[in-house]
């Protein structure tokens, strides 16, 4: 039987702990993103987010300020982690990872801002795409549905919500 040095085992456990923080943050960011989208972007921060719901020319919109803020939070957490609060750098990496996935999927797949815009190919991506289209179906900031990014309720539920909100 081969025995491993204790330092190697501790190092492996430390890396597993860090990876758990990273992936846990990625998952938690869906909840944070959903709440921020619903209550900040469609609430008091609508003045910045409105550009995302209206036709515009060019690649940039005032809504991109939210992505810059997310990047600053991620960078700040990584910096704090490097300054001695080690787990925070992995939280920052998870926040940054969520931001990268957001840009790739949201801007590339949902809004097709990339030169070679891919189309959703599987049931999961098609559901997210359709939910996002329903989110944009309601004019203005009130009455929207599906504020999440990586999770969308079943389409039949969202369609019922849209119909109910149109008749208010």
What are these regions (language model features)?
Residues 20-24, 90-95:
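Small-residue packing motifs within transmembrane alpha-helices
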Residues 17-36:
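N-terminal signal-anchor transmembrane alpha helix
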Residues 71-78:
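Hydrophobic, membrane-inserted alpha-helices
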Residues 35-36, 95, 119:
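A general structural-boundary detector
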Residues 2-16, 28, 43-44, 48-66, ...:
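Cytosolic/stromal cytosol-facing helical appendages immediately following the last transmembrane segment
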